Each structure stands twice: as structure tokens, then as C-alpha cells.
Amino acid sequence: MTRRAVRHCEHFSLCVNVGKKGHVIAEDPRERFTIYQYNIYGGGKAGVMFEEGYIESQVGVLMDLRPHVHKKVIFEATEDFFTIGFNTLDKNQNWEGRLVKKNETKLDLNYIRELEKETFLICFDGKPVVNNKQMKRYDYARINLSKDYDIKLNNGALGLFFKN
């Protein structure tokens, strides 16, 4: 059994899957909008139907799934899992994403500032502090590119995403 939840924003959505070892999920490209994935714990193997090879999920890593958004994908849990997906609302809209680095005490926005793109910070885990405000899992904030942001990860995980 898997529990699923979705949190919508006007620019993207977050989907959450929590399940047990052995569970199988099949996603049709008409329903698949996940372009990045972060595993809190556990995981499994995912592959594109009728293609060789698979991707093995990794805990604490932001996985880039953009190449698979238009494909039929099957996932089998090799252990109990808790996964958060970053979803585009428009498959023709590209997003770039990365995790904030453990040693990043000021949010590095130099490249994004040059591009002047809409940017969001998302809390995947823990209780990081951004400009003296504590975030919790699933919180997100639009980044004002004219400001600087002080970061204390506190063993948490923050994702930085911008439309490209």
C-alpha cells in the first residue's frame, strides 16, 4: 500500500509517496509530471517500460528525472520508502534544480540572477533556517533575486529551483 499526497503552488506541485517494501507503482506519461525526486528514506528501482536498465533511488540526493517525464515508468520498492517529488505543471516548461550545499551559508544565486528567472526554495527535510525563519518539510518560498539569503541547514535539506 502507498499513501500519496500533493501540495500545489501556482508554479509547481510537490507529490509525496510513502510505502512499504515490495509495492509497485506504474505511471502513465499523461499523469507523470515529476521532474526531480528526493528520498527521505528507503527507495527502490525505477525503469522505463520495455527499455533496458533502471535507476536506483538514493536517500538524500536530488534525482533528476526530467528525461523520463514523457515515458511510462514502473517503480518497485526494495525497502519501505518516503519520497518527495518536484512536479512541473507544464511539461514544456523546463526547471533547473539543485540541493543547497551543506557548506552553503549564503544562498548562491549568482547564475540565476544573471538569468532573472523565477526561483523557489523548498524544504524537503529537517528544519533549516533561512534569514532567521525556520522552515519545515514541504514549506516553500519564492526567492527575491535582489536579496541575499543566510542559510543554516541544521542537517535539513533545501532544494533551489528556477524556471529556465
Where are these regions (language model features)?
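Jelly-roll (double-stranded beta-helix
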Residues: 1-164
